[in-house]
Amino acid sequence: MSACRGFLLRRINDSCLTFRRHKFKKKWATTLPKIPCSRLALQYFDINYSMQFGDLWPSIRISLLTEQKYGALVNNFSHKETVLNNLSALKAKDFISEAQSVISLLQTQNNVDTSEKMVFTEVPLNLVGEKNDAEQTQATNLLSSLSNSKLTCFTFSRGDISRFPQSRSDCFGLLEYYLMDAASLLPVLALDIQHGHSVLDLCAAPGGKTLALLQTENCQYLAANDLSTSRSSRLHRVLHSYVPRDQRAEHKVRITSWDGRLWGDLEASTYDRVLVDVPCTTDRHSLLEEENNIFHRIRTKQRQMLPLLQTELLVSGLRAVRPGGEVVYSTCSLSQLQNECVVQRAIELAATDHGVLVKPQDLSCFREVFKNTFNFFQDCRVGELVVPHLTANFGPMFFCKLLRIK
């Protein structure tokens, strides 16, 4: 027995390692530490936006990484007066009403006769500036439209980081206001919808801008489209929560899930106004959220193809608007490649491939009228860009207005 035990102990002491080959070796993609999508987005933005914005980038960067400010878009179909009183009690202010006061003050300063065709000459705040007659008329009409806007959106003052409470339902089951990035209303205001217009919202979901279009109370007919059926379902829910049934009847509002790139073939030269709020890198979301992040490795190809998709959607929108109608292109990205470059490329393609001639419209008056609420980047070649700032943490929001001539 003792001999057997001694033999076993010797075997244990004399044991050695043996190497085995496995059928598969571990892949490097599963063994390397995973970098969060938000970190990848930040690295990408640091490389690109530091070159684009220079010394402004550190300020924009910290603002993007900080909690966003919201605006409360008042539901005109609810008990508006009660809602206005409640929001005013929170020390919030209607930024659109404040802009209208600025316009009124400028008209008074320049002794403008509002009964005649308004021409802003020698405006000290350079709302119109040195423009030809056509551009002057366009700027004047846009300011006049802003003065008469029925949209109401409350925001807290610069530096005030208060939050709005969740909206409540009124006695008819409609929510009182919609919380959104207040800068998202600027493309809707730029669209200058007049009474009786037919309007196309080409990429409508999740529904904030679509709701704002209906709140103008000027849309005779609104077509709201989004390729994603799940996002279209969310759009349905938003409209059901804020808009009475008779105001979203089939002859007034149509919701579809078609490929927006085909709209120029489906309904060419049909609409008075078209909003093209395209899919983009959604810069703020990409920095703060991991879920559904465009910077996920499996979505690399999709992200790289964004400028092409955006260009195709804008060309489709330009074809869908009638001659004399207007298109507003917008993104929630700071990227010059997704903003100005897309606009310029779409203008070229629309002309060469489809014979559609368009002209960018001057929106510089927005910078002056809304400067108390938003921070604007001053060096866009076309369009306007709201950049986040710690005291006014809205955006990013790029928007550009295009007039179809032919």
Swiss-Prot record:
Its EC number is 2.1.1.-. Gene3D superfamilies: 6.20.240.40, Vaccinia Virus protein VP39 (3.40.50.150). The active site is at C332 (nucleophile). Belongs to the class I-like SAM-binding methyltransferase superfamily. RsmB/NOP family. Its main location: mitochondrion. S-adenosyl-L-methionine binds at G207, G208, K209, D226, R231, D259, G260, D277. It is found in: Mitochondrion. Mitochondrial RNA cytosine C(5)-methyltransferase that methylates cytosine to 5-methylcytosine (m5C) in various RNAs, such as rRNAs, mRNAs and some long non-coding RNAs (lncRNAs). Involved in mitochondrial ribosome small subunit (SSU) maturation by catalyzing methylation of mitochondrial 12S rRNA. It comes from the Eukaryota. CDD domains: AdoMet_MTases (cd02440). GO terms for cellular component: mitochondrial large ribosomal subunit; mitochondrial matrix. Coiled coil: none annotated. Keywords: Methyltransferase, Mitochondrion, RNA-binding, rRNA processing, S-adenosyl-L-methionine, Transferase, Transit peptide. It is an enzyme of class 2 (transferase). One of its GO terms (biological process) is mitochondrial RNA catabolic process. It comes from Xenopus laevis (African clawed frog). GO terms for molecular function: mRNA (cytidine-5-)-methyltransferase activity; RNA binding. The keyword rRNA processing applies. It holds the Pfam family Methyltr_RsmB-F. It catalyses: a cytidine in rRNA + S-adenosyl-L-methionine = a 5-methylcytidine in rRNA + S-adenosyl-L-homocysteine + H(+); a cytidine in mRNA + S-adenosyl-L-methionine = a 5-methylcytidine in mRNA + S-adenosyl-L-homocysteine + H(+). This is 5-cytosine rRNA methyltransferase NSUN4. PROSITE patterns: SAM_MT_RSMB_NOP.
